[in-house]
Amino acid sequence: MRVIEAALPLPLVRRSRDAIVRIGSERLRQSYFTTFWLPRGAVPAHAVEEAVLALWRLAGARRCDGAEWWLGRAYTTDIPVEFHFDQDVRGRRRRHPRLSSVFFFNSVRGGQLAVTDQVPAGRAAMRLETVAPRRNRYAIFAGNLLHGVLDARGLTPGKRVQGPRGRLRLTLVVNYWDRRPTGVPTWSESGVYRGLGGRRRSRLR
């Protein structure tokens, strides 16, 4: 895994964060499953896609066909995703991105990105690397590795953690693919998160 500190220019980080604030709580529980496609050579539609293009250059995935991106929004007391492999979930054959990556917008209690050395159909994981959420930190790893998000205690998530939910963990997840994953729309095609383009909704809490 490769970790880059101070990955993006701060004005771009702020504009991207402001755009995300505009969508409020839209699809908050489904945010990890609301993904978009940005083809190579595309003109960004808003600040978040500008950030995707900037991260793409840092990742070095120059020959990829495009980037699949989504907003990872969750409270670390109630993580909505288990450990998993990134893959073309609607495709007929198992296919993984060339690279997976996570950009962090803020620091939170727990919420570490955890990446194992386990690959599909391989032996069980023998090694685990973690990256704590910090503003403007960017983590890049091979797209076929088992990974997940730890909870507020820094443990594998299970039941909801009791106590105050704390700050919302906010990330931009970008996967780089040799070919477009099946059925993933562009942001313009999707009809969701219109606030990213400028129309304001209720603020995130």
Model regions and ranges:
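Catalytic core of non-heme Fe(II) oxygenases with the double-stranded beta-helix
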Residues: 63-68, 72-197
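Non-heme Fe(II)/2-oxoglutarate
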Residues: 1-70, 77-80
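Eukaryotic intrinsically disordered, low-complexity regulatory regions
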Residues: 201-205
